[in-house]
Amino acid sequence: MSVDNESLYLYNLTIKHPSSCIASIVGQFLGNKKSQEIILANSTSIELWKADSNTGKLEKIYQQASFGIIQGIDKIRLVGTQKDYVVITSDSGKLVVLEFDIEKLQFVPLFQEPHSKNGLRRTSPGEYLCVDPHNRAILIGAIEKNKLVYKVQSNDEGKLELSSPLETFSKHTLTLQICAMDTGFENPMFAAIECDYNARQQDNGEEEDAGEASLLLNYYELDQGLNHVVKHKSNEKIPGSSSHLIPLPDFIGGLLVCSKSTIIYAHPSKDKLYLPIPIRSNTNETLIVNHVIHRLKKNNFFILVQSQLGDCFKITIDHDEVNESIENINITYFDTIPLSQSLNIFKSGFLFANVATNNKLFYQFEKLGDDNNNTTLQSCNFSDYNSIFELDISKRSFKVAGLENLALVDIMETLNPITDGALIETLRPEVPDPFKQLTALSSHSYLKTLTHGISTNTVVSSPLPIKPTAIHTTRIFAESANDEYLVISSTLSSQTLVLSIGEVVEEVNDSQFVTNEPTINVQQVGKSSVVQIYSNGIRHIKHTMRNDTIEKKYTDWYPPAGISIIQASTNNEQVIIGLSNREICYFEIDPHDDQLVEYQERLEMSGGSISALAISSSSISKLQRKSSYAIVGCSDETIQAISLKPHNCLEIVTLQALSANSSSIAMVPHGYSTSVHIGMENGLYVRVTIDEITGKLSDTRIQFLGSKPVQLSVIGLPQLQQNGLLAISSRPWIGYYSKGDFKMTPLLNTNISNGASFYSEDIGGEGIVGIDDNNLIILTISNTDGEESGLNVNDDFIINSVKLRYLPRKMNVDSPGDNEISSSSYIYIIESEYGITSPFPVTVLPDNQKESTNENIDTPEIDQDYYDAFGFERSRHSWASCVEVIDFNNQEIVQTIELPKNESAISLCRLQFESQQTKNQEYLIIGTTQDQKFLPNSYSNNYLYTFTINKSSNKNKSQNEILEFVHKTELDYQPTAIIPFNGRLLVGMSNFLRLYDLGQRQLLRKASSNIEYLKNIIRLTHQGGSRIVVGDSSMSTTFVKYDSTENQFIPFADDIMKRQITALVTLDYDTIIGGDKFGNIFVSRVPETISQQSDKDWSLLRYQESYLNGSGSRLKNICEFYLQDIPTSFTKGSLVMGGKESIIYTGIQGTLGLLLPLSTENEVKFLGDLQLLLRKYFDYNFDDFDKDKNGYNLLGKDHLKFRSYYNPVKNVMDGDLIERFYELSQSMKIRIGTELNRTPREIEKKISEMRHRSAF
């Protein structure tokens, strides 16, 4: 590919996929009859989860990116089989049937049946998807006009087969909902709520009121004999508020039509029945949004429906099987859970709630609500539709209560919707290196902090009598399950302390260890011996079991006089030591009597003193009990591989230079290869692969772990069926293999300075024992709540949440100075929520007088737990809004300022006014609007609130006095964007830019400029000097300069296309990055000549004529990329210490990703060519698919078209696609590598390097 040297090239990586799931389905996708799995589908990926019926926990099995937009998902199964397939509709224009391949651990497409053009259109089938309950047919429908039906059958080989689609269409018809009816052995039938918009128009051309107009309930029958779809028009119309259909089991037939506060039973050949829905007290209506049907034994079943407020109702039906008629339909209040997109019930008695705007929840049924005494309504009391509304509201209202029938057992952390995000870098006293955390306003009323790492749970913390410097663990017998000795060494006091491990940790007095010298290493060798290596020798202790007692007999080995042991490495069969005279001594264990047998020759290292030494541990590799090589680190900044094979023992086979001295080395086999892990004194960690035959070192990977020397030790990870690595620098890390790559992840909640692997059944299995100052620490790797031991490799983040009052909109991070410890980092958050009434008193008075926000106000006691569970009281066209201050380090709210009723906070910024004599006094400005309504948008008043920030006096004051109210200023338009600008406040409102300074009673307007061709300014960013960039809601971005002589803001360059801006950030003086509401990310730059004129020849550029309803010049479009998520924030920074600065973005559906700038022309060409080859490999043409030459394209969507959905992708490499290189077979990797003139290992190294430059 050709490369423009003056352009910018980016590499996109998705760090966290969207968590907003459009649907969830439960089935037996693994083919196991005794277990069920659940599939979650978001717009761009599908996830497979498994529920543990014993613990009630959900475990992710697999996640697969779709590289397309998923519209609908359902399941289908062939008769006589026990495995479910997945049916998906998407923007690829194909109906896709997937099977989960257990061997490959991925979803594999069985069919990709094209039915329409690529893309999303209202006439393209795919918006609706439903499968016949008896798996005989699949219907896909468009929003308007078209529907397709596929017959499902099995071929001669017993495999699933789809027929050609049968089409049916209705002119001028909009489809609102479709469901598949259960007709038993009759022809498959589907029901749809539809609207004939042509008939809705009156003769005079006016339209009926949508709320009063009726809808149609039409039936579509697949005549299997005639192979034709027949449309049955309904004779009676249904209410205009009808929005949900619930099909009933075949022995009853028909369906339930859910409308506003009403349920209607409908059947093509039976009379209708009417049932009112209970209404929550203090509300006016109930709308059913989703349901789940659960069948019990025989013909028993119940329906669980959920309302728009989250209230769940249980519907049961009294059916007369003799007369085949319904006697009664009953509905009663069940429980209240968060509003969900879908509900799923497992056979094991669990309920999964696919919550729409919060964490997904997993419940267990405690009971079925049969003894519920709350409001119960029955259809037998109502003869027609109008009789429902004659019922007194008090007889159908109910009060919500805590969970009675359900018990919460697991929480699946999600981030959607993210409204704002930031990267915060803090310093902590216990860790000298910066600590990076992502914060996001997400999940409806939460501030979520994402920390890269794995949580730990401290089991034991005990002081020690000596100052420890190293710690070791060992068994006594080879067949022992638990570690029995804990050996603590101190070089400061030249002591060794031996502790026994059991129910109580206590000192051992008869261990026969040398205790008056520091221990270098301890190892169980042979069958029943232990080796202690200390500075002046090796003690071999043999244990013999006689008469239930253990006899101990020891022998000693001493180095030559005046020589000491400085390094050692051991396994069950081998011992190798490094002496102070630079000699290497090698021992093997006699298998008959466990004695040490020294190799007659010694090797003198020529590269300086020995700084590190390692051999492979036999406990890791059972196939090869002895290590073939030893790795020696020397003080001349080299490592050398030494053969331990019989024919060339102690012969140097490889030498490799390092950038610093090695401080620790470990060898860990994995699969058919062995990795050499090197910790260095400069804080770098290096991983290389050693060839088992030649001993050559290759495939070097480097990562920065901290500012202190790196110490390594091998630990057991039985839950991953592998051994991992514990690396300790300025903070501890754990290394393990995941998804084909080795990952290093920090350990949180601990600050151990030395550690070792530790196994004990008393702590539930494998753990880590370490030293923290003078304390002995025993910890386990656990989940976030510390309840169970286990390493979750599917999530790189630990999420901590702070509950907020209302829906958060924007935040401003107030970080301390570079030399400060972050004990006073605050986050200021504006929150506002529509359609609710707040119970909290106003703490900012509505007049313009200066009032303290911290006066003692007598407030009634507010049940916060009630509002957290059930939400605030609903009220039309009402707003509640507040400002909250979060102490970031302590993760707590320190101040809340409730704004006046019906005011909504929409913008904020923090600045210092240059006109003020008080130096370093910061102000927080909040922009609000009053009585805002939508469709059409209207408001009554707009204000700017001014607060002082009193951080410096916080130590002597109550924490509630961080913000103090100064005054408020009335505005003409909504202050949708505010930023500091050269010591003043710049406000974007409507199409005006106004400059304000601080006054005594209000803000003083200093300048006002009207940019005529703009519509609504919603984003502002300061480029530096007098230049700003304006982001408009429909007119994209415009570069503007402040002319101080005329006191005006004058535009001089704007975008080449119209965009609906949602996020905007400065990259440099001439360049910006932005996102729009259609999911695009773009980078724009001012042409160099225009930029120079704006600074040097402003008089020429100032009076240029407008061009095509814009400024006289246009920006240059550098990058273009489609995300399929609306960007809400951009932050410049790195997610790892010492990483390269990149652009971190968040998306409203919960997406986290980064855009990494590429450095060299060769890098751009290589990644561009690799991306092109992978596009060809994952070809979207399924008809010509060859599994030896192609990879599976999940949805059959062309990757280039996906990333170019609205505009052609430009100068952005898709790292998500490139990382699929790991999935390729070895032969395909070689073939692609040949075309790129690279080996597969070189390509994998480059892909890994790209990720670790700024991420993990």
Curated annotation (Swiss-Prot):
One Gene Ontology term of the molecular function aspect? nucleic acid binding
Q: Fetch the Pfam families from UniProt.
A: Beta-prop_RSE1_1st, Beta-prop_RSE1_2nd, CPSF_A
Which keywords label this protein? mRNA processing, mRNA splicing, Nucleus, Spliceosome
Main location class = nucleus
GO CC annotations on file: spliceosomal complex
Location of the protein in the cell: Nucleus
- Domain of life, per UniProt, equals Eukaryota
Q: Which GO terms describe its biological process?
A: mRNA processing; RNA splicing
Q: Which Gene3D superfamilies match?
A: YVTN repeat-like/Quinoprotein amine dehydrogenase (2.130.10.10)
What does the subunit section of this Swiss-Prot or TrEMBL entry state?
A: Associated with the spliceosome.
- Function (record text): Involved in pre-mRNA splicing and cell cycle control.
Question: Family, per the entry?
Answer: Belongs to the RSE1 family.
The protein, known as: Pre-mRNA-splicing factor RSE1
Tell me which species this is from.
Debaryomyces hansenii (strain ATCC 36239 / CBS 767 / BCRC 21394 / JCM 1990 / NBRC 0083 / IGC 2968) (Yeast)
Protein encoded by which gene: RSE1
